A protein has these predicted regions:
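Structural preference for beta-strand elements that scaffold enzyme active sites
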Residues: 7-11, 88-90, 110-112, 142-148
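Acidic/polar active-site rim loop that often engages polyanionic ligands
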Residues: 15-26
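An alpha-helical appendage that flanks or caps ligand/catalytic pockets
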Residues: 29-82, 120-193
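A conserved active-site cap/scaffold subdomain adjacent to cofactor or substrate pockets
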Residues: 97-126
Length: 193
């Protein structure tokens, strides 16, 4: 945020890749809960001062620099963000009726609905975001909701048709076949129905 002089947007997600969770040894844990715990600590670091001493109840992440802090050389100090009180935080959303979007609204994070979702599923995110904002006495602003879309502009119709539909080796077809395989393996193919 400091390098970008306030033009930084923090993109976050609890992550849906089971392989990442397995590699980290958290395959059977509630990754949404771990994500919430991590975000709480990040926000506390940005709002706090050294030595931080962050120790939230029911949160696995504890942060302190009390023993190693050496202010004369900058040890134990985490810089404040350029944007105050913090940069904009945008969270990706895939699941229809995602409960995570409620938490985004409650924390004033902004949702980004995935590019491959059918419109009927992306539309379910708005109601949950508005519910989250209402939970903290605020009104949701549609300008805070982003919907990703994949757009390809070709030199002519034939190229566009080949890229999007006819050529089985096109990057577009490859991307969606990979997404579909991942969703089927994770039993989440409902996003395509």
């Amino acid at each position: 945020d400091n390098l970008a002089r306030g033009r930084f947007i923090l993109g976050v997600s609890p992550g849906a890749l089971r392989s990442d969770a397995e590699a980290l040894g958290i395959l059977d844990e509630d990754r949404n809960q771990i994500f919430a715990e991590a975000i709480d600590v990040i926000l506390a670091i940005w709002a706090g001062e050294t030595p931080y001493d962050i120790d939230f109840e029911n949160n696995r992440f504890k942060v302190t620099t009390a023993e190693t802090r050496y202010l004369d050389v900058g040890y134990g100090i985490m810089p404040k963000t350029f944007q105050q009180p913090r940069p904009e935080i945008v969270g990706t959303v895939v699941a229809p009726f995602s409960r995570g979007v409620i938490a985004m609204g409650e924390r004033d994070f902004h949702p980004l609905s995935a590019n491959f979702l059918l419109p009927k599923w992306a539309a379910t995110h708005w109601g949950n975001y508005a519910e989250g904002k209402a939970n903290v006495g605020e009104v949701a602003d549609p300008a805070d909701w982003r919907i990703a879309r994949t757009i390809f502009v070709a030199d002519d119709d034939a190229t566009a048709k080949a890229y999007g539909k006819d050529d089985t080796n096109s990057p577009y077809r490859f991307y969606y076949s990979q997404i579909l395989k991942k969703m089927i393996r994770g039993n989440r193919q409902g996003v395509f129905k």
